[in-house]
């Protein structure tokens, strides 16, 4: 590839790396959360202080009501993380090979997968916002305002800016 083609694809060069990194982040998060939830404490990543505000029940109250309910809540998070691993693997592989080459189908696949994922995550988070809980990574459900901002930046730099550099 000559220098003209290389420089004209600067956003795509950044974009595929951002999206592949986003996939890796999802995989890492999806491995760490179940380990912490099951082996250390569910209150660190599965049922945080924002969740207690949302439900009106502390983790201790839930476990006092039913230890099995607490365990079940942890298993729900583990099952969600199982899906995040698959999402992360697909995100990373589609980004690394076809999106890096500028293939439009890869961009469309990443766009739709990430927009739907974002809408779902933002919807859950706005449910918390509607109750005055803005979050800073202290919930197993809501991603919180800081993470929504990061997510928007990932979509801008990973997909929006590179869109014009795709192969025709």
Language-model segments: what does each one mean?
Residues 2-168:
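Topology signature of small-to-medium multi-pass alpha-helical membrane proteins
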């Amino acid at each position: 590839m000559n220098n003209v083609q290389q420089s004209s694809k600067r956003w795509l060069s950044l974009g595929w790396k951002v999206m592949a990194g986003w996939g890796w982040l999802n995989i890492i998060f999806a491995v760490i959360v179940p380990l912490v939830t099951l082996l250390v404490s569910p209150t660190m990543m599965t049922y945080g202080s924002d969740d207690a505000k949302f439900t009106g029940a502390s983790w201790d109250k839930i476990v006092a009501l039913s230890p099995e309910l607490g365990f079940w809540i942890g298993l729900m998070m583990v099952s969600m993380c199982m899906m995040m691993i698959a999402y992360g693997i697909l995100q990373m592989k589609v980004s690394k090979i076809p999106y890096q080459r500028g293939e439009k189908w890869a961009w469309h696949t990443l766009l739709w997968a990430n927009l739907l994922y974002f809408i779902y995550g933002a919807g859950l988070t706005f449910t918390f916002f509607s109750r005055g809980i803005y979050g800073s990574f202290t919930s197993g459900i809501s991603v919180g305002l800081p993470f929504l901002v990061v997510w928007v930046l990932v979509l801008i730099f990973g997909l929006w800016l590179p869109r014009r550099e795709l192969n025709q």
